[in-house]
Amino acid sequence: MKRIVLLAGVLCSMGMGYAQKLTHPDLLYTPERIEQVKQRIGQDEQMTSAWKEIKQTAEKELKGNSLNKADYLSLAYLMTGEKVYADKLKTILLKTIEAETWGSAEMLARKPAWRSDLGLAHKAYLSAIAYDAVYNDLSASERKKIAKGLYRLGVEPLLGDWLLEPVRIHSLNSMGHNWWTSCVCMGGILALSLQNELPEAKEGAQAVYDYLPEWFNFAGDVLQQKAKTFDEAGGMYESLNYANFGIQEALQFYVAWKNAHPGASLSDIPQLKNLSSFFAHVCYPCTGIADMRKKAGKIL
């Protein structure tokens, strides 16, 4: 997983010039970033090693039909152009949309039923990456069929439960931590990938973009004993790991949005300005035997 994250981080692109329709692939694994990675392989030891492991994993996935490693298959296809990966992604997507639901039995048994959770959010992300990668290898009818299936299984439950009226069952007061950003933002990325075929998907992605700043700005609720999402210094009350996951999901959506809307300005999020200081403060040992301040003093 660390290997795919290494390259995924490099593959985040900010383009220039506005486009009404998405030119696939154009979310995270953009042609520009793919080319940059190709140039670095052979020159950067870590990048070369990461790519080798990713391709090996993708080759193993050719033997199955699981969505779980669709990001590996997608990257392998975009890096190599080998149709065997595209064919496998197409097969996986067509098989995936045959499901009745992606919801878990545990969550669906709740009252009211939770149609979506973190597991479903991750499936939405993987589906978005796969659809974006293989889009140009699909016929018009296949694009439409897969888009409708992914919208039903992923976008509608995620944005329906967590964001959109009149079916929304969660709020920042009830679920203001990183579940909210994961479910909303991964649903948003999937919606972005489907927007050429489905106007409702484009509207859903726009709603995510419009409302996402409210998660950062949530001021808490004294009556329900809910702390605000971030304090003035940039810290998150639910711990470093919760902050990392929640912010990661939000930023991935913003990167995909920016790539899909080159030239557009992103919303101003003041809380982002303090996040690097927060992470550095929490991760930098300053007590006991691991006190880096003492070691720094000796070195200086």
Describe the role of every protein-language-model region.
Residues 1-21:
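Bacterial Sec-dependent N-terminal signal peptides
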